UniProtKB/Swiss-Prot annotation:
Belongs to the RNA cytidine acetyltransferase family. NAT10 subfamily. Residues 1038-1057 have a biased composition (Low complexity). It comes from Dictyostelium discoideum (Social amoeba). Transmembrane segments: none annotated. Keywords: Acyltransferase, ATP-binding, Nucleotide-binding, Nucleus, rRNA processing, Transferase, tRNA processing. One of its GO terms (molecular function) is tRNA N4-acetyltransferase activity. Part of the small subunit (SSU) processome, composed of more than 70 proteins and the RNA chaperone small nucleolar RNA (snoRNA) U3. Residues 549-682 form the N-acetyltransferase domain. Acetyl-CoA binds at I621, A622, T623, Q628, K629, M630, G631, Y632, G633, S634, K730. It catalyses: a cytidine in 18S rRNA + acetyl-CoA + ATP + H2O = an N(4)-acetylcytidine in 18S rRNA + ADP + phosphate + CoA + H(+); a cytidine in tRNA + acetyl-CoA + ATP + H2O = an N(4)-acetylcytidine in tRNA + ADP + phosphate + CoA + H(+). This is RNA cytidine acetyltransferase.
Amino acid sequence: MVRKKVDTRIRTLIENGVATNHRSFFVIVGDNGKDQVPNLHYILSKSIVKARPSVLWCYKEDLGFSKHKKKKMKLKEKSKSSGIDSVNQEDPFDVFISTTNIRYSYYSESHKILGNTFGMLVLQDFEAITPNLLARTIETVEGGGLIVLLLKTMDSLKQLYTMTMDVHTRFRSENSKGEVVCRFNERFLLSLGKSEQCLVMDDELNILPISSQSRSIEAKQQILETPEQVELREFKQQVKDTDIAGALIENTKTMDQATALLTFIDSISEKTLRSTVTLTAGRGRGKSAALGLAISAAVAFGYSNIFVSSPTPENLNTLFQFVFKGFDSMEYVEHVDYELVKSTNPEFHDAIIRVNIFRSHRQTIQYIQPQDYQKLGQAELVVIDEAAAIPLPLVKNLLGPYLVFMSSTINGYEGTGRSLSLKLIKQLREQSTVVSNSSNKALNSITGRMLREIELNEPIRYSARDPIERWLNELLCLDSTIAKSSPTGCPHPSACQLYYVNRDTLFSYHKASEAFLQKMVGLFVSSHYKNSPNDLLLMSDAPDHHLFVLLGPIDENNTTGLPEILCAVQVSLEGEIAKESILNSIKRGYQASGDLIPWTLTQQYQDEDFPRLSGVRIVRIATHPDYQKMGYGSKALELLTQYYQGEITNLDEVNQEEEEEDEEKVDQNKGSSKISTVKKDNASLLTEVIRPKSNIPPLLFKLSERKPEKLHYMGVSYGLTQQLYQFWSKSKYLPVYLRLTSNDITGEHTCIMLRELNNEQNNTICKDGWLQSFHQDFKKRFINLLGYEFRNFNSSIALNILYEKKVNNTVAVASSTTKNELTQNEMELLFSSYDLKRLESYSNNIVDYHVVIDLLPSLSKLYFTNKLKIEDISLIQSAILLALGLQHKTVDNLIGELNLASNQVLSLFNQTMRKINTELKQKQEKFIQDSMPKLSIVAPRTGQFKSFKGDIKETDMIPLAEDMESELEKGAEEVVNKLKHQLENDSSLSKYLVKGNDEDWSKALKPGSIPNSITIKRKSDENEETDKKENNKKSKTKNNNNNNNNNKKVNNQKSKK
């Protein structure tokens, strides 16, 4: 083996890192770079005075060598026995692998290394690295350690600009209109050259020109004690004699951690059980250790029921480790004063879930899952570790009438810390008075609960002001802070303009563009609950993403300062999916990456035409915290809508396009592009100089200077809250989808809203009114689901979703209302006659409201589907009807939700039922009236109508042939005759009928002709007389016949004789 002298700057950089407790970064370019890892590890081992540093080796799939130590030893023994191998022929890399504590990890399993500390990190397979992985792995390296990045052999480092990363496959979709541009890789490479603690070398340890900033590295003297360490030592000396606190603070590593522990002890000693202490910090600041020491202090103060919550008990290893360190400091003995209970669940890997203390009295430290918040009835102290990783509604449920400690990671790579700091802590701050460490106890909150906020800034794994940490925060914008508002005041929204951001310039690593990027990312981070470093890669490289910013009037005299960003918008182009892919999605369930809104709505509505439309999804919109609720967000949306509708045009657009075509032709002739990226010289890896691009275009473009894409709609997907829904609905967006399951982090349901664009240049693929049909179908499904998944919604949010403002598609709503009228068949199907009687009785306050509760679902659906049009129902009455009828809530639920008394709720509900009952009665009367047959009016054509032309209509006013009085008399006479006829036919009454008609009675009753006695004959007597007469006639005829027969017989006898 040929020995080669290593550049002294490499050894000096490693030794300086050990002396200052800072980390060092090395980039090795070449396929043999792994062979230099043992040399760097050897230099590090000689520089530190402790055991050999452990190594974390991360890779994608193939490690490139065997990591199996037993196989290596067998092969070595076999080669030695055959006499082939010798000590001189032993490979240094194999010796390094076999003698060093190395942990190998796939990039996909890098989450398992959280909480561990290593002395050296090796990263290979650069194409698989993402910003999340970069931050997650680098944070595990301790102070004085090394970070080694291995790159493959390349002729120029600028090949990284065009390298295809694995994550780029997620950015491409079927309808991508552009190619992926590796802007992040370029910015990453340029940042390495600027870092003073980084060296870029080839696989022979020759330092490349990109590290020209580190031409001369001077050796630094080891600092025995930093100012922070001196302050901590003096502080420990001061509290040494303090009971409990003195012993526990000895375990702290930084001054921030000691101050945080002291704040915890102050809250514990008060024993008010109405305080909340929040601890926020970046990763590696000692949050879990401070909580563990605080729990041991609570045990010393006599707290009996202590509960600890975390996403999983495995995350509490560090916390319980420092609980036991605190016990050791207070001279607690295991098995004598306390005992441990480990979990038998194999998923928890023997994690500690309970600690029983029985030194003075029985005390317990119990792990509890966030879902079991109902079991906290007897709690005195609840500790929530990594609260940002727990869904926000569960964290709220964990709060109660007891002392609460919670910690959360912010500005970290998990991307969940902002959810807690933005929402929960903000609510606690608003509901209570923040009590500082030096404040008086009399400064209590109105609600009887105090809030203390603690923040840890000083790292523990390495010393403060670590160059690698500063480089990583700048590269990934992890520590982006919001600039304070301008002292000149805020401009009126009408005076602001929306600008298009050129991403090539934004990520060019120029000083001005870097400052603008930090401002923009800080704006996004402060306004959204979930942020991760991968979002930065999406902003920079995704071909379908675009950025816009809203700026106030630009001062031309200000040539130094950057304009203040009032609002930032990130959008993504979606849609225009091929018909084959759509059919595969509908029939086979196939779904490509990207295109969130088209694929989601295709699955929900099974529509083949909508995914073929082109649209834009608003990924993020963030307003400056100092300028929120001033109209800037609405103004940005308004200008963005006008831009995509083609309302913002440029008169010189045609000329500009012709000029650009001419410039492209000239550039092609010259053989160079407009933006100079790669020089045409034959510079090698050892001689090339990497600098930012020159001749870059402007950072900001006016909307009139860029031609918009042809779009059919604009959409947004967000976590549903009442405030956000009102914001989007005010901008004329209609909801079309609401996810049934809530988000794991925020507990909010994802909502998709769309707005149709009126662009005359677009070819309409869907039928007219497609958005309104989606919205009506969504409302119908939402109404049916309010009693199930959406039952816990606040009635005001549900009412906002169902309430249509007049500005939203008034024509479509008006045309659809005629079809939504209640029909007679529907009414008979939904309500029986008994139902209507009960509703009538309740409206008249005769029965209780429980009698009509079963009618509420049907009545509510009719009202909210516009089949019962009642104009004078107020919003509060509609909310009560929705909550009781559709969400199946009780009156007790509405008392707290609407802040009304029970009698007020029932009174408003009764008024609503009265109005509904009146409307139903009117509907019923109308149905009866419509069911009656219509009489056709027939009038003869008399002389007075000779001038009339055409057929006589039913509505013509023609006089009848007979007046009403004569018609009534005829009718009465017919009725009397019918009654008489019925009486005459009745056998039981007919014998009592009096003889005589009207004329006979009038003659008999004449004055002066009335005799002293009157005999009245019955009709029955008359009938008897007539019967007798008829019988006599019959008997006479019979006798005559008999006589005639006798005479004939006599004559016959005589003739015979």
